[in-house]
């Protein structure tokens, strides 16, 4: 009952805050969201697709068209683990990827390949540092890159787990973990997006491995 009513309570509190302090107070959060969304879009639609094309010669457009339902499911559930069966089935039946390979790489990727989470944490650290007026040196930024990467490896594929590991990243550069509260209210939307990016990366890597192992049926992939 509490979980069902909580969103309404949060909405009322947000509406009250909005009416009291105005729209300007939300501009930094909107910029943060825009920054994360832009980075995720570049990773999912540019970087991954360029890697797919470069290593396999397959059409990125056809790949996205066939994998879009899986991305939509991942977006709605915000969990990589729940998407595993659908990813394996889609790769096998619609893209010609070996099920023997996908049954290994997709669950593995759902555990260690959290690019979207790393991206969010990098942007979040910069946002929180600016909110507290703390300057980050190049050495601090390098530490964030390494820590965010390590924190994403082995992270459970469940909703909002990135906020939990973000605390470790903040501690690595001496930022207050209380800053997580600044972005907690809007993280659900970003969590859904980064989950879609994460599982897309898993699928791209699986397709590449299947191609390199000569276990990719191109006729199935090119079939409408």
Task: Briefly describe each language-model feature range.
Residues 3-11, 47, 117-121, 194-195, ...:
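Alpha-helical transmembrane segments and their lipid-water interface positions
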Residues 1-5, 38-40, 56-63, 95-102, ...:
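Membrane-interfacial loop-to-helix junctions in multi-pass transporters
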Residues 54-65, 91-95, 170, 209-210, ...:
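Juxtamembrane helix-loop transition segments at the membrane interface in multi-pass membrane proteins
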Residues 1-62, 219, 223-224:
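Signature of multi-pass transmembrane helix bundles
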Residues 122-224:
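Transmembrane alpha-helical segments and their short flanking loops
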Residues 69-152, 206, 218-224:
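Helix-loop-helix junctions within the multi-pass membrane cores of secondary transporters/permeases
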Residues 30-47, 66-73, 141-155, 165-170, ...:
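Small-residue-enriched core segments of transmembrane alpha-helices in multipass membrane transport
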Residues 1-5, 29-37, 67, 71, ...:
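Loop-to-transmembrane-helix entry motif
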